[in-house]
Each structure stands twice: as structure tokens, then as C-alpha cells.
């Protein structure tokens, strides 16, 4: 059965050639990204435990995580957290399997703690955080689950929803993405341990000049005073300027912690490396899209991908799929930009979308008619192999934020 794939040429100014471009990335320690990361870690842990016990991923969605900011008194040399960060795990997961209880809350809380321990170095998970699992219950008859899986080897969409992807990234998009990845890389943390994980990067390109505004939480126990703090800021700026020279030939201005007022004793220092310690809250889906960026110059889906089940939830699968299709088209065909939008219809096989729309701005001197069939074939092949995205998610080979 042929798939509903439409390839068309569109006429618009590519983002790289527009006068103004805005790009944002919330780093892994930002409260919104903490919520995303925990939601995804919980979903992955539940999926693996379901497979281990029952041989199949049972229904769940853990895309409702709230991070409620705590209270801290940071000070140079080391402060303290006086009110812990509260993290609420919510959503739904099968807890009763053939009259046997499955330890949803135990698995979820352990996954959340492991994620925090592995992600935010200066966070004492046992003392700085309270994790509360209120994941709703569900029950299932395994025989009916297996029978349904046999009847429908391709999962049926559990929602009418769309996913969006685009490629290639502009220089500004790459720079914003790579800046946060640099500052939160293991190598950089070893060289400059004072830089916390809560790193937010905002990029503005105006013509051929790029402004990068970086908010980087500095860990108070790693700096002895204002002088050392300012030295850390200088090192951040220098590292990002060096990175920028490898990414673009445009002029790049780097600003770090612009709310600081040294004369008034105002510095962005934290005890834990995340602003969640001091009243900054976070929610799933309020931050980066599945490509790791927030891009108001582009089409975007508002779906919260993190924590959604990797089997049939198109809010997760179609956003990743659209990104993969766009990337392959951009890498193999003469396109300036490609936009992919995929729409499901609830109850229908996820490899048979209601529409897969591929909009292309071809490179100068080319027409989409030259490679329309190739673009169609790329999308068709990804849809035919859509279930491999589930495996990529479970193996942690793709990030959704």
C-alpha cells in the first residue's frame, strides 16, 4: 500500500539568508531540561524492566514531571541548600499485570535518582532533592497484549498528532548547540569544574554578526571569591570564542552572566550547579525540541517528546522520524533547506501516516523535480523501518531534548 508522502518545492528565504535569526538551547542542568531528562530516564527504565519481566513494553507515558525549585544560600567557598528541590513524577504506567503488581514507583524513583546522580555533579540527591512518584495506575492482561501485538506487528497510533523536523542546521543553530555541549562536556568540566550544568545559550544573528548570551551557573564551592569567579567567566568566553571560530567566519560576540553586578556583590553562583535550587521551576516539554534547540525561525511541534512511550506515541516517534528524514535528505540531495511534517491518525498503523509532507528549498540551479523520487524513497524507507526508532530510544542512541 503506497504511503501518503507528498514532496513539494517551496519558495521562501532560507533562514541562513534572513536578516534576523533567534536560537536557544537550555542545557542539561536547566530545570526544564532536568524535567525532560528525568521523564525520559523513567520511560526508558520502565520499558527495559517491562521487557525483562514480560518480553514486551507495556503501556506507559511518564511525560508529566514537575521540578519545583528549592531554596539555597550560595556563597563563595561553599553555601548550603536549606529547602530541597521537589520533583513530582506523574503520568501513567501499567502496574497490575495478570493480577501481579509491577514496581512502577520503585523503578521510576531509582531511574530519576540515577539520572540526577549522573548528570548534575554537585547535587546531593539524597539531601538536596525530594522525589515523589504519583504515576497513575493501569492494569493489563498479558495474553490480550500479546495477541494484539501479533495482530498488529506495526503499532497503532495512540493519538492524532504531528511531528516536525528540518535540516540542515544553520551556523547559528550549530553554534548554540555546540556551545552548550562544550560547556557541559566531560573534558571541559575537568578543566573548569566551577561551571555548573545549568547552562542556557541564546543566540541572535543580526545580518552577519552573532551575539551569544550565556547564563552559566557557577558552583560556589569551586570558587574562592569574586576574582576567581570573574576568571572563570573569562575562560568560558575564551573557550566559546575559540569554538565559534571553527563554526563560522561571522563576527561572534560572547556575553557571560550579564546580570552580574560585581560592585553590588551580585554574581551567578549556586551550591549545586542548577538554578532549581533557588526557586526556578521546570516542566517537561517547555524547553528544547528533539533536535536539542528552540528555533522560532523554523516550524516546530509543541509536543513534549520526553517520557512518552517509544512504541506507539507519535508525539515522540514522529518528531524523531521527521528529524531523521530531513537529515538524510539534506545530506544526500542538493537542498538548501528541507522541512518534514508527519501527521498520524489515531488507531492507524504508525508506518501509514495520514500525511508525510516534505517541503524543499532546492539549491540554486536545481529543481525538486530532479530528485522528488529520491526524497520520497528516503521518507518511505524510514517509515517502513519505523520500529527501529524504538530500539534507538531504548539504547540511548538518540536524545529527545
Swiss-Prot record:
What's an example of a GO molecular-function annotation for this chain? methionine adenosyltransferase activity
Q: Which UniProt keywords apply?
A: ATP-binding, Magnesium, Nucleotide-binding, One-carbon metabolism, Transferase
EC number(s) in its UniProt entry? 2.5.1.6
Q: Which residues bind ATP?
A: 136-141
Listed pathway(s): Amino-acid biosynthesis; S-adenosyl-L-methionine biosynthesis; S-adenosyl-L-methionine from L-methionine: step 1/1
Root EC class: transferase
The answer on whether this UniProt entry bears the keyword Transferase reads yes
Catalytic reactions on record: L-methionine + ATP + H2O = S-adenosyl-L-methionine + phosphate + diphosphate
Domain of life of the source: Archaea
Give the GO biological process terms.
one-carbon metabolic process; S-adenosylmethionine biosynthetic process
| InterPro entries from the UniProt entry | AdoMet_synthase_2_family, AdoMet_synthase_3, S-AdoMet_synthetase_arc
Which cofactors are named for this entry? Mg(2+)
**Record function comment:** Catalyzes the formation of S-adenosylmethionine from methionine and ATP.
Q: Which family does it belong to?
A: Belongs to the AdoMet synthase 2 family.
Report what the protein is called: S-adenosylmethionine synthase
- Native organism: Pyrococcus horikoshii (strain ATCC 700860 / DSM 12428 / JCM 9974 / NBRC 100139 / OT-3)
The uppermost taxa in this organism's lineage are: Archaea, Methanobacteriati, Methanobacteriota, Thermococci, Thermococcales
Amino acid at each position: 500500500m503506497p504511503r501518503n508522502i507528498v514532496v513539494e518545492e517551496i519558495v521562501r528565504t532560507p533562514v541562513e539568508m534572513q536578516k534576523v535569526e533567534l536560537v536557544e538551547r537550555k542545557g542539561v542542568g536547566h530545570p526544564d531540561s532536568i524535567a525532560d531528562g528525568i521523564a525520559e530516564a523513567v520511560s526508558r527504565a520502565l520499558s527495559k524492566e517491562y521487557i525483562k519481566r514480560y518480553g514486551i513494553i507495556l503501556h506507559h507515558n511518564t511525560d508529566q514531571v514537575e521540578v519545583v525549585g528549592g531554596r539555597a544560600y550560595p556563597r563563595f567557598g561553599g553555601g548550603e541548600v536549606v529547602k530541597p528541590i521537589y520533583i513530582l513524577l506523574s503520568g501513567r504506567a501499567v502496574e497490575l499485570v495478570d493480577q501481579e503488581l509491577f514496581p512502577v514507583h520503585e523503578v521510576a524513583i531509582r531511574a530519576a535518582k540515577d539520572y540526577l546522580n549522573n548528570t548534575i555533579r554537585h547535587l546531593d540527591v539524597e539531601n538536596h532533592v525530594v522525589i515523589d512518584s504519583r504515576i497513575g495506575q493501569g492494569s493489563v492482561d498479558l495474553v490480550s497484549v500479546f495477541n494484539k501485538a501479533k495482530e498488529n506487528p506495526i503499532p497503532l497510533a495512540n493519538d492524532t498528532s504531528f511531528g516536525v523536523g528540518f535540516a540542515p542546521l544553520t551556523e547559528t543553530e550549530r553554534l548554540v548547540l555546540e556551545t552548550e555541549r562544550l560547556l557541559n562536556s566531560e573534558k571541559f568540566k575537568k578543566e573548569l569544574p566551577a561551571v555548573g550544568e545549568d547552562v542556557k545559550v541564546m543566540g541572535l544573528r543580526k545580518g552577519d554578526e552573532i551575539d551569544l548570551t550565556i547564563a552559566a551557573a557557577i558552583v560556589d564551592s569551586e570558587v574562592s571569591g569574586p576574582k576567581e569567579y570573574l576568571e572563570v567567566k573569562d575562560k568560558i568566553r575564551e573557550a566559546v570564542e575559540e569554538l565559534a571560530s571553527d563554526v563560522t567566519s561571522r563576527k561572534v560576540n560572547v556575553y557571560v552572566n550579564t546580570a552580574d553586578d560585581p560592585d553590588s556583590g551580585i554574581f551567578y553562583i549556586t551550591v549545586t550547579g542548577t538554578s532549581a535550587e533557588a526557586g526556578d521551576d521546570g516542566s517537561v516539554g517547555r524547553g528544547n525540541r528533539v533536535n536539542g534547540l528552540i528555533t522560532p525561525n523554523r516550524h516546530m511541534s509543541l509536543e513534549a517528546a520526553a517520557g512518552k512511550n517509544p512504541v506507539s506515541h507519535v508525539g515522540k516517534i514522529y518528531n524523531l522520524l521527521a528529524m531523521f528524514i530531513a537529515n538524510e535528505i539534506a545530506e544526500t540531495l542538493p537542498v538548501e533547506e528541507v522541512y518534514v511534517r508527519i501527521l498520524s491518525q489515531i488507531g492507524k498503523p504508525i508506518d501509514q501516516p495520514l500525511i508525510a509532507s516534505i517541503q524543499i528549498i532546492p539549491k540554486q540551479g536545481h529543481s525538486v523535480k530532479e530528485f522528488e523520487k529520491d526524497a520520497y524513497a528516503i521518507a518511505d524507507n524510514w517509515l517502513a523501518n519505523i520500529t527501529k526508532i524504538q530500539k534507538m530510544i531504548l539504547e540511548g542512541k538518540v536524545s529527545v531534548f
